[in-house]
Amino acid sequence: MVHAFHDEAGINSTEETRHAGVEPLLNNSPYGAIYLIGPARAPIGYIVITFGWSVEFGGMDAFVDELYVRPAVRGRGVASEVLTELPNALAGAGLRAIHLEVNLSLIHI
């Protein structure tokens, strides 16, 4: 799915760079996490969250690095639901802020 997202978003990445970016996050890296969206046997997407520190917010913050939903299930509110539930899912991590950047050219309305 990461390859599909990068292709769609015009991100020039290789298998090696994708593996180097994903593998630590799948193995309990303190720098971030990857969560599958949907059932583990047949996920319909994923979200990558990375962690940092914010002087402005006075503590740890998170950044939505990637959010991907398979084309066949888009337009059903899946991404909206994930983003709405994200603060609840990360509440125990002590986050002070969650940041999201949007590439408007990728929005399919």
Model features per residue range: what roles?
Residues 1-59, 65, 70, 83-85, ...:
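Acetyl-CoA-dependent GNAT
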Residues 91-102:
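Conserved GNAT acetyl-CoA-binding A-motif
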Residues 74, 88-93:
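Peripheral/terminal regions associated with large enzymatic or DNA-binding modules
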Residues 63-64, 99:
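Generic enzyme active-site microenvironment
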Residues 70-72, 76, 104-105:
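Active-site acidic-Proline motif in GNAT/NAT acetyltransferases
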Residues 107-109:
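Conserved small/polar residues in nucleotide/adenosyl-binding loops
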Residues 80:
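Residues forming the Rossmann-fold NAD(P)(H) cofactor-binding site
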